[in-house]
Regions:
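N-terminal ligand-binding lobe of clamshell/alpha-beta domains
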Residues: 1-221
Length: 221
């Protein structure tokens, strides 16, 4: 893993560096997940970052995990507990604010969101806004600004702390890209746990592993 703080800025890929044959888990993480010293390596990025997330997020108490309102590409449409997005949130160390809603009642309003008072908001955007081949973020900035200034949500923890994240719909395509999304979100929501994790590089490796183009902007901010 590259050093440096968890990325909170525009995420772009513009090279084709290859994935190392093996990746070595930090000693603390290897010890936490019960990996022997002579077997601290992972042969794929998926194995590596799955283990890393499990180790780091395992340090959280339940009361420290954030509640997230996930908004799909449709405005005010959220996700149920049987969805892949729900599983993604769990793997990122968060709770789905809509987990108790019936699968046929996933269209909500600002009043419901305000009452749930989420700690963070995730908005899925088309791959024309964020995705492979996208390097300009004006559209993403505009969408995020609209969420941050949505009047009814001003009192929520997500807006007060500006925990509003935009995610490319292309990251929902495969297990590897959903893991990339989880790394982005976990690094953004829990920066103290992921200060040494380069989320940009992690996502590049995972997107490459999925066989998809990794040059572009997939997460904002």
């Amino acid at each position: 893993l590259s050093g440096g703080e968890a990325r909170q800025t525009t995420t772009q890929f513009d090279d084709e560096a290859s994935l190392p044959v093996t990746m070595t888990l930090p000693d603390d993480d290897a010890e936490r997940i019960g990996t022997a010293n002579n077997a601290q390596t992972a042969e794929t990025a998926t194995q590596y970052y799955t283990a890393l997330l499990s180790s780091r997020l395992g340090k959280l108490f339940e009361c420290q995990r954030l509640s997230v309102y996930w908004e799909t590409g449709g405005n005010h449409v959220t996700i149920g507990k049987t969805s892949k997005e729900h599983a993604l949130l769990l793997s990122a160390g968060a709770y789905n604010a809509a987990s108790r809603r019936a699968e046929d009642m996933l269209t909500v309003d600002d009043g419901w969101i305000e009452r749930k008072n989420p700690d963070a908001i995730v908005k899925v955007v088309p791959d024309s806004v964020l995705g492979g081949g996208v390097f300009l973020t004006e559209s993403a900035q505009s969408i995020r600004h609209a969420l941050l200034t949505r009047k009814a949500l001003g009192g929520t923890g997500a807006i007060r702390k500006e925990r509003v994240y935009l995610l490319s719909e292309s990251l929902l395509q495969t297990p590897a890209t959903r893991l990339a999304a989880a790394v982005y979100l976990a690094s953004s929501m829990y920066p103290d746990l992921f200060g040494d994790v380069d989320a940009t590089e992690a996502a590049r490796q995972l997107i490459d592993e999925a066989g998809l183009p990794s040059a572009g902007t997939f997460f904002y901010p």
